[in-house]
UniProtKB/Swiss-Prot annotation:
Protein species of origin: Phytophthora infestans (strain T30-4) (Potato late blight agent)
Function: Effector that enhances P.infestans colonization of Nicotiana benthamiana leaves.
This protein's name: RxLR effector protein PexRD43
Localization of this protein: Secreted; Host cytoplasm; Host nucleus
Induction pattern: Expression is induced during host plant infection.
Protein family (similarity comment): Belongs to the RxLR effector family.
UniProt keyword terms in alphabetical order: Host cytoplasm, Host nucleus, Secreted, Signal, Virulence
Motif RxLR-dEER, residue range(s) on this chain: 44-56
Range of residues in the leader sequence: 1-16
Signal in keyword set: yes
C-alpha cells in the first residue's frame, strides 16, 4: 500500500502541482484616485468626484413630514416640551383638545393645537433641537 502511494505521488511532485510556489501569487495595491488626495479639512474623501456636488441635509430634516409648513414647524417647536410631557402621559390629541377647552380656549385654537400635536406625534424627535 505504501509503495502504491509513493508511486502515485512521484508524478505530482515532478510536475510541480503539489507544491505551493509563492512567486506565483501577486498582490494588488490599487487605491482609488479620490482616496489618495486629502481634502482641505484633513479628511480623505470616500466619494467619487461625480458625487461631490450632491446636496447634504441633516437627518431630522429628512425625517420631517412633507405636509408640515414652516409656520406649523415653528409652532410645534415652541410647544415641543409641552407635547413631550403629553406624550409621556400617553395623552392623545383629543385629550389635549379637552384640556384646552376646560382652560377656556376657543374650539378653533384647541383644534389647531390638537392638529399640531398629531403632527408632532408622527415624528417627535424631528421637532426637538
Amino acid at each position: 500500500m505504501r509503495l502504491a502511494m509513493i508511486l502515485l505521488s512521484i508524478p505530482l511532485f515532478v510536475s510541480g502541482n503539489v507544491l505551493h510556489v509563492p512567486t506565483q501569487v501577486t498582490k494588488s495595491h490599487a487605491v482609488s484616485p479620490d482616496a489618495q488626495f486629502v481634502v482641505a479639512m484633513g479628511r480623505r474623501s470616500l466619494r467619487t468626484s461625480g458625487e461631490a456636488n450632491e446636496e447634504r441635509t441633516r437627518l431630522n430634516t429628512l425625517l420631517l413630514l412633507d405636509d408640515v409648513t414652516e409656520a406649523e414647524m415653528s409652532s410645534i417647536k415652541k410647544l415641543a416640551l409641552t407635547f413631550a410631557k403629553l406624550e409621556n402621559r400617553n395623552d392623545g390629541a383629543a385629550d389635549l383638545f379637552n384640556m384646552l377647552r376646560r382652560q377656556g380656549h376657543t374650539k378653533e385654537s384647541a383644534r389647531n393645537a390638537g392638529n399640531l400635536y398629531t403632527k408632532y406625534l408622527q415624528n417627535p424627535s424631528a421637532f426637538h433641537t
